[in-house]
Amino acid sequence: MVTFSVPRSGTGCTEERVCFSVPDGAVLFAGSRHGVVPAPTASLLVAGLCRLGFSFLVGCAPGVDERFRYTLSLTAETEKHTFVGCAFEKRAVEIGRTGLFASVVVPAEVSPHAALRRRTLWLVKRADLLMLFPDDPETGRWGRGSALAFHAALDQLKPVFVVTSRPPAQSLSYHLLPDRFFGFLDGYWVVPHPVAEGTCDEEL
């Protein structure tokens, strides 16, 4: 388990913190297909999460997915601990040529739109932590795929770190905590409150 400790904002007490633990399993990188993550940011983030013992999940889209696929392919250590979930066979073949393990994770008979949606849900289901870069620079808003990943993670009580200029609204369902991840990446932790009866996710 990896434990994060984040200052609780708005309390007036610098010592009050929210602590939560995440299995050191898989972190999913996701975000806008038009998004741009600077190469140094992606490299530092991947290196830090690798040191904590995480493996990596990422999708087959351009934009944010593509940046992290490239970063993860640069070292043997991250390459062997990365799985790329694909919506289409053509993408899996192309990505496989980069050295990363890529596989189609949806049935062949579904429509392209449904395939993209089911790929996202498949990846969120298998992640322990979601790192989300949802802002679409063309619209200034979150993309639909990013919103889907965000809500799916919260439905499954999984924490999300969101790098965005449009933070989620406050909610009784989760803590919303501004933070600087690893001391360099500004964003917001969205940490669902525990539910005694378990999660509200279902088989996807």
Task: Cite the ranges covered by each PLM segment.
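Acidic/glycine-enriched connector segments
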Residues: 4-24, 33-181
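Glycine- and charge-rich intrinsically disordered segments
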Residues: 1-6, 199
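Conserved donor-binding/catalytic core segment of Leloir-type glycosyltransferases
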Residues: 28-29
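Leloir-type glycosyltransferase catalytic cores
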Residues: 174-204
